[in-house]
Amino acid sequence: MIDQELVQSLKAWPFKEALQIIKKNGGLLNFKIPSKGYVLLETGYGPSGLPHIGTFGEVVRTSMVKNAFSFIIDCPTKLITFSDDMDGLRKVPENVPNKEMLEKFIGKPLTSIPDPFGKFESFGHHNNAKLRSFLDEFNFDYEFVSSTEKYQSGDFNETILNIFENYPKILDIILPTLRAERKETYSPFLPISENSGEVLQVKIEEYKMDSKTIIYKDPSLDKLVETEVINGKCKLQWKVDWAMRWMSFDVDYEMCGKDLTAVSYTHLRAHETAVNL
């Protein structure tokens, strides 16, 4: 039996966040466990650099919300830490060895870049391992999820194809928020060049709905190339990628900074709406 008076007296921010999750799922009196069987909370990590106190802090705060939720409601919970390790390397971090070697891999997925420390399969794998070790040392209850593994295994395929089929609606949402020069080349899809291995931000010349493929000009070949959008051949632009994860995992809660609140959070919900039409 929920003591509503006690719950309403809980003013600390983790409880306020937990109550938002409860409200989303029917409220205190009519709470319904999600169809997946648990409430899912997510944290994110960009392994283009070593994990730091900010990464740790996000997991700490999300765990506080998770614990507050469990204090109020008797419902299974799960926390996943999602690594964006399929992102392209944008710049070489200052606090790593072999910087000149890494310079050659700018633009390539983090899990396709050699580990400058020489210990793991890739730079992305190295940083993922550091994060997991960091979290395990403090006994966090979490499940680690790799973007590369999810894209390449096909786990995201169904949602990606849904996005592909509804890409005009998504463009209608995103394009008004972009600068003029960015509007000309923006696409929800970032193809990964089979020639250079880079994650490309290029104009998509054609979306072929029958074959679920896109055609783009590969700058490393200077010619048009056709590729499928699933099975890790493309990744999604970050805002669409974020919404795709929420849909694929059925995420109930994720903390976000200023760039993912207000307008960006509205985009997230709009993406979810668009791809469900």
Predicted regions and their residues:
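N-terminal catalytic cores of NTP/NDP-binding nucleotidyl/phosphoryl-transfer enzymes
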Residues: 2-94, 243-263
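Non-catalytic, beta-rich accessory domains that mediate macromolecular interactions or localization
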Residues: 51-53, 67-72, 76-78, 96-120, ...
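Conserved adenylation A10 loop of the ANL superfamily
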Residues: 52, 197-199, 266
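Charged, often glycine-rich, active-site loop that binds/positions anionic groups
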Residues: 86-102, 159-160, 164
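Domain-scale activation on soluble regions of proteins
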Residues: 91-93, 122, 277
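Short, compositionally biased low-complexity segments
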Residues: 96-108, 132-139, 231-245
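Active-site neighborhoods of enzyme catalytic cores
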Residues: 108-232
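Conserved small/polar residues in nucleotide/adenosyl-binding loops
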Residues: 266-273
